[in-house]
């Protein structure tokens, strides 16, 4: 059964940069997959990111973000890359409580945890998901 919801982390997952909050806007878009900040720091989308987002939307899969970042900076980067319109419920908050972010997303979108997939490179989330959502 395909997921009803894909929740994406940003740093090191959707894009190459490991901490978008450390960048210095404004951003300038270089091409479809790259932006640069005022300090000449480049941020590149993962090579599969665009296809994943487009495919999910075509199939009616909801998309959300759960990211520990400065919301102004992260959301500006998404806008400059033209990706903000893909997400049904972006949660970008300046704290490490991603479990609360995921719970907020599930509640807001009315999706059960077993119908959601979380994409992140952070292994600390895996153990939390196993305890809290997978039984």
Mark where each language-model region is.
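Phosphate- and divalent-cation-binding pockets in alpha/beta enzyme and binding domains
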Residues: 73-76, 101, 127-128
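Preference for well-ordered, secondary-structure-rich cores of eukaryotic proteins
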Residues: 19, 54-61, 109-117
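Acidic, divalent-metal-coordinating active-site segment for phosphoryl/phosphodiester hydrolysis
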Residues: 120-135
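Substrate-recognition element of Asp-dependent hydrolases with the DxDx(T/V) motif
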Residues: 44, 49-79, 89-96
